[in-house]
C-alpha cells in the first residue's frame, strides 16, 4: 500500500475497546464519545524498522509505525488524531481513510496533514540513511514543507505555523476593513495590513 516495502507489512487490527481500557483517563467524559463518533476502526499496516527494511535505527527512533484510521466522517476532530499520536508514544504516520479518499497525517511538534487524495495518487518513499532521516522525509512528504537552508525541520515547521497565523490575521483584518463603515477606521486597518 502506498509503495511501502512488502517486508514492512503487518496488518494488525487495533481494537478501540483496548484503547478505551488502556487510556481510560485520557478518554474520559465526552472525549470518548467524540473519539467514537469520528473513528470507526484502526489497523497498524506497517512497521518500518531495522528488522523489516534494513535501515539503521537511531537513538530516538527505533521504529516508525503506519496506522490506518477508518473514519466515520470526513469532518473529523484534529484533537482525536493528535491524541492517537501522543498516546502511542511511537513515531506514527497516520493514513486517514474515508470512503475512497485518503489523507496522510503526522505529528511533529504539531499535527501536519496532506490534502485528501485517491490511493493511486499517494506514494510514500523511504528516503534516508537511518530511521531519523526517513521520519524527517515522511514529515516533509506529508506536510509539503520545504526545509530552508540553516533551519532544522522543527524550526521550519514553526516558521510555517507562524506564516499561517499571520496570513489568517491579514485575512481577518481585510474582512474587518471591508465591513467597516467609517472611512478613517477603514483607512487605519488598510494601513495595518500593508
Task: Kindly label every feature range from the protein language model.
Residues 156, 160-194:
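Alpha-helical oligomerization segments
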Residues 71-149:
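Extended assembly-interface/linker segments at domain junctions
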Residues 1, 74, 149-152, 193-194:
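Generic structural signal for short, solvent-exposed loop/turn connectors between secondary structure elements
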Residues 1-88:
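N-terminal, leucine/charged-rich tether regions that mediate assembly and partner docking
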Residues 5, 9, 120, 124, ...:
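Generic, low-specificity signal for short hydrophobic/alpha-helical stretches with a mild N-terminal bias
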Residues 134-136, 140-143, 147-150, 154-158, ...:
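Alpha-helical scaffold domains
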